[in-house]
């Protein structure tokens, strides 16, 4: 059994095609489905959690952020583990923490245990997408990377759909504790699937990181991460991950529900239905992108150009959603879902800027920025809602104030995305950089 765990008896034909390619993709996709379910479920459970725990908006944001904190803290170790041991051992080992965290959350009777349980869940699912991206970079053609990334998000968004209306339907029967017990059981099933069906990384020479003078350095050192953190493409795409995608995660997984209830005055049931349709639009957009992106490339439209346009349009959609509270408000949220589906493409652009041997560290380093941003946005939105109320604003106006501040931050990040070569031309004058973006 140990030999099966650590060695690779069956050689893979690279790149993967056909049945083997689909099988490997499904293993990653099912795990990511569970990850997204854990991430999104608080948007539906928040009224029950608030009632049971009597917590404020800021405290609710902190509880939800505990998932993101655990997720973010695990990213650097995940990158090292992925490059050293491969996706299979890394993802299985970590998902055990998710099962333990879900069981702790299920049985918790105080805020501290809830916080600890949700943080463990964040640690446990922290490699679900990154393991997939690392595996894709190693086992699939490079021109398929954006398409595979979008396909993964189809399954992730399916998890968000599962965590919205379906959870609302079963909630009266099993309660929020039963929801987490069920997720723990599904997560355990995913571990079994990963164990038996994912390829095993062949043991190789102890991995080292490339730097310009070709010296070998320790994996966990500044010299190991300097080429990543100072890479022009990484820096240019950083705001898309930390601000745009991070903020989207904060809205999708927590604040969209309270917005619909407190600003648009929908019931909890109606809010859950609208969150379901928001995620359905997102899923359909990911599906369209999976087939649409390769065709755009054929006519000369780069992934970076597509990402830039969608990021800009998303600002318009959010501005309308935040400030126009009429009957068309849900339309603007739908447009935001459509445009935000492109944010994840920044990850594939960053990863393909580096050699395959670095894919684990590159993907997780960028993911750290995403989840630091998501944690700050999730907490910050709640903080300024509470502050707005303290300053004498009504609850709907406090929500609008907080969302408006978030929109301004996004606009600054978008400005950097577009004008970075003008701000720092010395970073963007090489053909290597131009060819990537």
Question: Which ranges hold each PLM region?
Answer:
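Juxtamembrane intracellular "pre-TM" segments in multi-pass secondary transporters
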Residues: 8-17, 202-238, 436-437
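Extracytoplasmic
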Residues: 23-57, 252-257, 377-378
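Extracytoplasmic gate region of multi-pass secondary transporters
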Residues: 42-43, 232-289, 374-382
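Conserved MFS/SLC helix-loop-helix module at the cytosolic interface between two early adjacent transmembrane helices
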Residues: 73-112
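Helix-to-loop junctions at the C-terminal end of transmembrane segments
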Residues: 76-86, 286-301
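Paired small-residue
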Residues: 97, 101, 112-120, 328-335
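Cytoplasmic helix-loop-helix junction between adjacent transmembrane helices
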Residues: 117-155
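Helix-loop-helix hairpin linking two adjacent transmembrane segments in secondary transporters
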Residues: 151-203
